Amino acid sequence: MKLATLVLVLALPAAAQAPSTLAPTGTLRGVFLGSNPVQGRVDTATGDATGPVPDLVRELARRIGVASNVIPAPDAAGVIAALNNGTADIGFLAYDETRAREVDFGAPFAVMLNSYLVKAGSPIRASADVDRAGVTVAAVRGQTQELFVSRTLKNAKVRVFQTMPPQAEVERLLTSGDVDVFAINRQRSLEAEAASGAKLRALADSFLEVDQSFVVAKGARAKLDAIAAVMKELNAAGFMQRSIDRAKLTGVRAPGVK
């Protein structure tokens, strides 16, 4: 490469160099947890994805001048698989050390709170009341909350579900006493409380505050560097907090926002 050409390439802004790094196919393919409202929601009728992650993927694609494709995955394992088999370029997950063995994590795009859900008449009033003998805590396998409670609770029993039960089953499990607590994110806890007709109650405090972050396939750190350059501009402009507010999410905030 001639010296003049090399100087020109090095002088290009990161966003100008990002297309080949982030979207080698010409389309930025972002995979996210389609069942997690903190990241986004998928309209079952149209298939359209809305929310913070879809907004972010589309804005990143616009800024680097490529098309975008937002891909919902059923769970964290699906996000990781899509990255490592090359069907997605970037993904989004809450940080956990076990996941970091399979994918590389970048900077957070949001901070998520997690709150236990109990039946309305439960004597459990705060997160500190949960880890006691005789208490059964439900969680969904592989989700951030399950990884946390399985690792940290010493006295309570953890009951792991393969998938998130529907609202009616969550109500039955809690009100019947089959389980005493459901460990989910705050947005889901509040939605379940609201839908229950006063049968359920989300605890007021958070048992875990966790970063929602960009993830890429192992060894693809160059993608995270390219994303960081664009995200610096987006964060300065308040892009993520506006997206979170537009989605009417509770217990979620952009990094640096109190």
Each language-model region and where it sits:
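Ligand-binding clefts/hinges and TM-proximal coupling segments of bilobed small-molecule sensing domains
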Residues: 18, 144-164, 201-203, 232-258
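Extracytoplasmic small-molecule ligand-binding "clamshell" domains
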Residues: 18-94, 163, 226-227, 237, ...
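Bilobed "Venus flytrap"/periplasmic-binding protein-like clamshell domains
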Residues: 32-37, 46-63, 115-166, 187
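Periplasmic-binding protein-like
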Residues: 34, 111-121, 186, 194-232, ...
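Extended ligand-binding regions for polar small-molecule ligands
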Residues: 48-64, 122, 128-136, 143, ...
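Acidic, polar ligand-binding/catalytic clefts
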Residues: 54, 58, 62, 67-131, ...
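A ligand-binding cleft/hinge motif common to bilobed small-molecule-binding domains
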Residues: 77, 93-102, 148-151, 175-208
